[in-house]
Amino acid sequence: MLSVQPKGKQKGCAGCNRKIKDRYLLKALDKYWHEDCLKCACCDCRLGEVGSTLYTKANLILCRRDYLRLFGTTGNCAACSKLIPAFEMVMRARDNVYHLDCFACQLCNQRFCVGDKFFLKNNMILCQTDYEEGLMKEGYAPQVR
């Protein structure tokens, strides 16, 4: 997205229609932009500062967050049933999606860390201790993930 402008012919900015005299310019959607002119249509953030990816839909140029907010899909957390915004990081277990804070054993509330084993029983996530206790009491065998 960021380019060094070669000496010689200056490019015109697609945002303000003025010549780009700066050493650096942005190229997006086959057009050239001043760094200050390529902004998200919703939040006005400078897209050159927030990453190398921009999103476009319905003639709007958007940052990732606003694109997902406007056009992304949302769902509900399998643990708390509250809405999960499309831009939020999540944890997944099979077809279930969880807020990061909700990804914990649903019996003892122990939060899982990277690499921890968890078990799925009747769409409930369980830690190894609660799974083994339940296995001994009830004889159930959820799947290890």
Curated annotation (Swiss-Prot):
UniProt GO cellular component terms: nucleus
Domain LIM zinc-binding: 11-73, 75-137
InterPro entries: LMO_RBTN_TF (IPR050945), Znf_LIM (IPR001781)
S-S pairs: none
Pfam families: LIM
GO MF entries: DNA-binding transcription factor binding; metal ion binding; transcription coactivator activity
Transmembrane segments: none
This protein's record includes keyword Zinc: yes
Protein name: LIM domain only protein 3
Record-level GO BP terms: negative regulation of transcription by RNA polymerase II; positive regulation of transcription by RNA polymerase II; regulation of T cell homeostatic proliferation
